Regions:
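Short, well-structured N-terminal submotif of metal-dependent ribonuclease cores
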Residues: 1-35
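Alpha-helix capping/helix-boundary segments
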Residues: 9-10, 39, 86, 104-105, ...
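Short, flexible loop segments at the rims of nucleotide/cofactor-binding pockets, characterized by
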Residues: 10-13, 73-79
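PIN-domain endoribonuclease scaffold, especially VapC-family toxins
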Residues: 26-33, 37-77
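Acidic, PIN/NYN-like endoribonuclease modules and their adjacent C-terminal/linker elements
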Residues: 36, 104-138
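Acidic, metal-coordinating catalytic cores used for nucleic-acid/nucleotide bond scission
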Residues: 76-83, 103-106
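Acidic, metal-associated active-site segment
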Residues: 81-98
Length: 138
């Protein structure tokens, strides 16, 4: 399983004792975690501004991810120009899932599959992982 992480997921995983960070740490044993320079740069800028003491840990975590090229190409979905590099990155990285918390820009696509990439929230992704037996409900 290949999972592309949006910038807001990378940022959220930077919080101390984050349940999301714990989930992603466990998930690394079952999946390839991906991002691209576009998401990485946005997340790092936000961590540096809002959680500067976590910047080193954030960089360490992101260094464990597979970095896919930032590419832009035409898509058959309605998406803001600023969000195209995220979905295009997930597609270019052959991700099975794009995990994002961006309800404003991706909300209309939640649960949909675009070019073999299913766009999900963290909660939706947890359901997928539970159904696949990768994690247990707790």
């Amino acid at each position: 399983m290949r999972v592309f992480l949006d910038a807001n997921i990378l940022f959220s995983a930077s919080f101390t004792q984050s349940r999301l960070a714990d989930l992603l740490d466990e998930l690394q044993h079952h999946a390839v975690l991906l991002t691209n320079d576009y998401a990485r740069t946005e997340a790092e800028r936000n961590v540096a501004a809002k959680l500067p003491k976590r910047l080193s840990a954030h960089r360490k975590f992101v260094s464990l991810l597979e970095l896919v090229p930032t590419r832009l190409f035409a898509l058959e979905v309605n998406l803001a120009k600023k969000d195209l590099p995220i979905l295009c990155g997930a597609i270019a990285g052959k991700a099975d899932f794009l995990v994002t918390g961006d309800k404003k820009d991706f909300g209309h696509l939640f649960g949909q599959t675009v070019r073999d990439v299913k766009i999900v929230t963290v909660q939706m992704f947890l359901v997928e992982l539970t159904e696949r037996g990768i994690i247990s409900q707790s």
